[in-house]
Curated annotation (Swiss-Prot):
Function of the molecule: It is involved in synaptogenesis and promotes excitatory synapse differentiation. Enhances neuronal dendrite outgrowth.
Protein name from the UniProt record: SLIT and NTRK-like protein 1
Domain of life: Eukaryota
Residues covered by region (Disordered): 268-317
PTM statement from Swiss-Prot or TrEMBL: Undergoes proteolytic cleavage that results in shedding of the ectodomain and cleavage of the C-terminal cytoplasmic tail. Glycosylated. Phosphorylation at Ser-695 is necessary for proper function in promoting neurite outgrowth.
UniProt lineage: Eukaryota, Metazoa, Chordata, Craniata, Vertebrata
Record PTM Phosphoserine, positions in chain: 695
Domain called LRRCT: residue spans: 212-263, 529-580
Keyword Signal part of the UniProt annotation: yes
Tissue expr: In the adult, significant expression is detected only in the brain. Broadly expressed in embryonic brain with highest expression in subventricular zone, subplate, cortical plate, pyramidal cell layer of hippocampus, thalamus and hypothalamus where levels are highest in ventromedial hypothalamus and medial part of periaqueductal gray matter. Also expressed in mantle layer of spinal cord and in lateral and medial motor columns.
GO BP: any one term: endocytosis
LRR repeat spans: 59-80, 83-104, 106-128, 131-152, 155-176, 178-199, 376-397, 400-421, 424-445, 448-469, 472-493, 495-516
PROSITE patterns the record matches: LRR
Amino acid sequence: MLLWILLLETSLCFAAGNVTGDVCKEKICSCNEIEGDLHVDCEKKGFTSLQRFTAPTSQFYHLFLHGNSLTRLFPNEFANFYNAVSLHMENNGLHEIVPGAFLGLQLVKRLHINNNKIKSFRKQTFLGLDDLEYLQADFNLLRDIDPGAFQDLNKLEVLILNDNLISTLPANVFQYVPITHLDLRGNRLKTLPYEEVLEQIPGIAEILLEDNPWDCTCDLLSLKEWLENIPKNALIGRVVCEAPTRLQGKDLNETTEQDLCPLKNRVDSSLPAPPAQEETFAPGPLPTPFKTNGQDEHATPGAVPNGGTKIPGNWQLKIKPTPPIATGSARNKPPVHGLPCPGGCSCDHIPGSGLKMNCNNRNVSSLADLKPKLSNVQELFLRDNKIHSIRKSHFVDYKNLILLDLGNNNIANIENNTFKNLLDLRWLYMDSNYLDTLSREKFAGLQNLEYLNVEYNAIQLILPGTFNAMPKLRILILNNNLLRSLPVDVFAGVSLSKLSLHNNYFMYLPVAGVLDQLTSIIQIDLHGNPWECSCTIVPFKQWAERLGSEVLMSDLKCETPVNFFRKDFMLLSNEEICPQLYARISPTLTSHSKNSTGLAETGTHSNSYLDTSRVSISVLVPGLLLVFVTSAFTVVGMLVFILRNRKRSKRRDANSSASEINSLQTVCDSSYWHNGPYNADGSHRVYDCGSHSLSD
């Protein structure tokens, strides 16, 4: 028996390859027992692969690998860690899991792969995780999920997929998976079908669906009915309509079947976001993103009726334009100016100006395919196509463009100076694409742009000076991206009136050099970010308080620390958020400012969070010292001045005596040369040199 054990251990070591040894015995990682469980902590060890390491074989353990560089997981990656019961792989930059990577982890019940860069779950991605009950994959770049991705997880109960880029769930994705808790917040879901999706999770006890762009049409009717039939407290949060316009901001549970699916013979009064796209392509005036006096109420996103109350959840800027439905008559219209319209597109005259060319949903893969090139096109719609990149050469013939819609394509690359020829462009839609970086060079030439929509991309970085190329920009839509910070002076030289930053990853925003440049802002949406309610957020809180609720859309909820989780930090006092700062204040000084909760706005990198009515010791002591030094220098200066004046006075007296002696000597000399006494004015003055001594 002993021989068999030795042979088994030898074969395992041989199969493992060049194993360096036990990560605990060789103290490569920190191994400690906590409440009877062994924790193998390999945080931030710089691991790029695990195939050369092993772990204790005599007991079960929790394996912590967060903060390493495990960017790819290959088959049998964890073959030497078969006693692990939980696996934590957060913040590894992980972007690919090769099927078979988890083979050998039959005992793992909890898998944490959140905060990485995973883009897809393929079939057999989780092969080997036979006992998995808990899967956390939030804050990734997840777009595609194979229908068979979870088919091997027959014990999975908790699935956390929030804050990804998921726009749809495939049929039968939950088949044979006993899901009880499902988190889909912060994705791109517009609808959830009942058949082959929702019907497969009958045991649901908790579901989260907030912060998705729900399209409240007939397709969402099945979701509404399903939510009404699950346990009363199963739905956590709200399902808020983002489209159509007439239902935007309304809770799904407050809608009726008639709201979601009006009769066909009734007119749907909702219109897409500015500029409106008419379904029949009838000639009409060029739409604008702002409502002016006399315009139709339905075509004014962001407008508030006179005397009405602005509803935070009904911010019209969130709406994405929807493609118009090209009717048969539109498709068969005669050629414009004797030239045929590009294949599959429809062209119309805009009264008093140029042409409107609609190529929405025409399977266009490149703008170079649009032939023949028409002159004087002012509105170009290319939404819902398959365009992957755009180049400067694509717009050489479109220098008169005023509106360009490239939304919902596959655009990941914008060549520098692509728009340099579009000097008259005022509206640019690039939402629902794959952009990850914005720079000044990409938007060079857009000197008249007023409206830019880049929501629902994968933007992680905005370079300094990006928006300086657009001095007339008024509306900027950046929501539902992957932004964690903004560069200094990002809004310098731009007079934004409306800004959307909701559903990103901001933990705080600096005031100095960023928010303080929004001097013309009238609407800003910041909800759905993981705010860290600590001392660093206090200047931002004060800035938000000055804006007021009529400018700041929606509430701002804390993500951390735990004691403030999901609390609106606008309702928290500064002392609650940053108690250690106020503990340093002199009791005497704080007694005079108990009612003050404002803080000095010095940016998030400063420790001066106190209101101007409060004076800390660190400010008071240097101030008093400065006064003392100034007074001392003043006294010394006065003494020096007095002493100098005295010396000058003595010098003048000495010079006066010397002058008299010289004068007397001159008189005596004069009498000598005249061989007798000198008489001044005859008998009035007589100097007898013989009777005076020069020493007198």
